[in-house]
């Protein structure tokens, strides 16, 4: 993407994630519980659980923690009955934001999400107000220096839909979200380990923010990310570091 480094953004994202690993573990445990409750405890027949368990491994979560979360989900233990709710809204300058939550109290959650939006210059939207601006996809990002031709051949053979080389030399591979695990397995079997691999809501168009606007937008995103019930925050805003 012209004007900013996707690779730098990913490294920043990973560093921020490492800094709040405990919070990430809490979110992953909730996701594992819900995935196991809805689709069973076998990762081979439950794609959502497989994805959550893979994320837990990437976050260095102990296997015992993962197993306990699966058991709680399958057994319907207290704490496993979370409700999935998506909120949509706008940041400054109309930037689109999607907030995915898992909650046991929707009244509390909607109040906290609305408060974060209003406190930091955004506002809540209605269902569907911004979701159409995003595509639900599997996304992989490979480091600059990765062989573009070899990766493209492996990715397309694995079932990926698109391979893009960014201005900073990193390479992005996109696939249908349902095919994520199969594509990931095929790429890794071919020797290609992504620095970032996730199912995400990818914006169709991005809006760059710099200076004071970037700082304001980052505060809003951080406020939403830090809410206990929030699992994921997606936006078409790109924070450009100057």
Swiss-Prot record:
Coiled-coil portions: none
Subcellular location: Cytoplasm
One cellular component (GO) term of this entry: cytosol
Primary residence: cytoplasm
Record-level Gene Ontology MF annotations: DNA binding
Matches recorded under PANTHER family: TRANSCRIPTIONAL REGULATORY PROTEIN YEBC-RELATED, TRANSLATIONAL ACTIVATOR OF CYTOCHROME C OXIDASE 1
UniProt record similarity statement: Belongs to the TACO1 family.
Protein name: Probable transcriptional regulatory protein Bcep18194_A5621
Organism: Burkholderia lata (strain ATCC 17760 / DSM 23089 / LMG 22485 / NCIMB 9086 / R18194 / 383)
């Amino acid at each position: 993407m012209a004007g900013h480094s996707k690779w730098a953004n990913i490294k920043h994202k990973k560093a921020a994630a490492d800094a709040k690993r405990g919070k990430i573990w809490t979110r992953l445990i909730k996701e594992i519980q819900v995935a196991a409750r809805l689709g069973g405890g076998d990762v081979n027949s439950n794609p959502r659980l497989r994805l959550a368990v893979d994320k837990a491994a990437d976050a260095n979560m102990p296997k015992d923690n993962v197993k306990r979360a699966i058991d709680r989900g399958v057994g319907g233990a207290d704490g496993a009955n979370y409700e999935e709710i998506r909120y949509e809204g706008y940041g400054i300058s109309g930037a689109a934001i999607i907030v995915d939550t898992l909650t046991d109290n929707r009244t509390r959650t909607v109040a906290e999400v609305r408060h974060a939006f209003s406190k930091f210059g955004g506002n809540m939207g209605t269902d569907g107000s911004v979701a159409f601006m995003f595509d639900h996809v599997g996304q992989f990002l490979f480091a600059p220096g990765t062989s573009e031709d070899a990766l493209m051949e492996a990715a397309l053979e694995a079932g990926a839909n698109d391979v893009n080389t960014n201005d900073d030399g990193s390479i992005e591979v996109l696939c249908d979200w349902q095919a994520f695990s199969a594509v990931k397995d095929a790429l890794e079997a071919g020797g290609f380990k992504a620095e970032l691999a996730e199912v995400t809501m990818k914006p169709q168009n991005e809006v760059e923010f710099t200076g004071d606007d970037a700082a304001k937008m980052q505060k809003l995103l951080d406020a939403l990310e830090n809410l206990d019930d929030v699992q994921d925050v997606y936006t078409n805003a790109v924070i450009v570091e100057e």
